[in-house]
Amino acid sequence: MSFPDITPELKAAMPELRGRLLSNEPLAPLTWFRVGGPAQVLFTPADEDDLGYFLPRLPAEIPVMCLGLGSNLIVRDGGLPGVAIRLSPRGFGEHRVEGEMVHAGAAALDKRVAETAAAAQLGGLEFYYGIPGSIGGALRMNAGANGRETKDVLIDATAYDRSGTRKLFDNAAMQFSYRHSGADPALIFTSARLRGTPATPDHIRAKMNEVQAHRELAQPIREKTGGSTFKNPPGQSAWRLIDAAGCRGLKIGGAQVSEMHCNFLINTGEATAADIETLGETVRARVKAQSGVELQWEIKRIGVAPGKG
């Protein structure tokens, strides 16, 4: 499936644009599941100024979606209408220490942020070492692990709205809840300041090793997977509910519930986005029938089915 090419009109309306505009660009290689259709337009801004130039000149009727690292994401097989924005490490990937704070661009890898903090003997950010995403995604979904989450360490975050206005949001304004931020979905986050706590190198390294060991032992990190599929219901573990419903190893097409960890769906090699999403909905239905609990997706699903763009 392909979309009408609108990049010539966009380029004509934005003569000073420095970033890349690509038409009908495949998104599957940019997601951890390696599935899905193309973006009608993929825009990679050169830097914050370039993003601020682009947004107000984009026609209001064209939808915009910021992709992040593509770890907790399913792009449907029909692709993504409108503009997908991908922030590059070159323009948005910095991570540096300022006193007891870490300034991190939205494209900075969570793991690298943890390492940068550790090198400055700042603790409290070790949980990021085990999260396969970027800081932008962490802001959007209040990413967390090992009993800690982004709301515990965020000082403030910078974002751009559709008018190209740069805005600053403190922790309270992010309206964090479990694996969710209540901030306007149209905002594109570009950086964050995170609070660290002075700690000894041995203490920090021990916590990071603990995080890594847990991932190695309990999660299918060498598979094509999007990470945790469903949110844990209050007081319960999603994987236990999935296992109790008999879904461990369940397959639909090329998608499978991981044998190692039931809250992970994997692409065994030939899965489509529809296979993965259908498998997830099947798991939800079986869990609801077995336990009465309605699991909520943690993985974000975007785009359209084939023929519906």
Curated annotation (Swiss-Prot):
Location of this chain's protein in the cell: Cytoplasm
Disulfide bond entries: none
InterPro entries named in the record: FAD-bd_PCMH, FAD-bd_PCMH-like_sf, FAD-bd_PCMH_sub1, FAD-bd_PCMH_sub2, MurB, MurB_C, MurB_C_sf, Oxid_FAD_bind_N
Any Gene Ontology CC annotation: cytosol
Catalytic residues of the enzyme: R179, S228, E298
Pathway membership: Cell wall biogenesis; peptidoglycan biosynthesis
Reactions listed under catalytic activity: UDP-N-acetyl-alpha-D-muramate + NADP(+) = UDP-N-acetyl-3-O-(1-carboxyvinyl)-alpha-D-glucosamine + NADPH + H(+)
Enzyme superclass (EC): oxidoreductase
Keywords, sorted A to Z: Cell cycle, Cell division, Cell shape, Cell wall biogenesis/degradation, Cytoplasm, FAD, Flavoprotein, NADP, Oxidoreductase, Peptidoglycan synthesis
Chief subcellular location: cytoplasm
Cofactor: FAD
Origin superkingdom: Bacteria
EC number(s) from the headed UniProt entry: 1.3.1.98
Domain FAD-binding PCMH-type residue range list: 34-199
GO biological process, one term: peptidoglycan biosynthetic process
One Pfam match: MurB_C
Record flagged with keyword Heme: no
GO molecular function, one term: FAD binding
Keyword Lipid biosynthesis among record annotations: no
Function comment: Cell wall formation.
Family: Belongs to the MurB family.
Name of this protein: UDP-N-acetylenolpyruvoylglucosamine reductase
Source species: Rhodopseudomonas palustris (strain ATCC BAA-98 / CGA009)
Encoding gene (name): murB
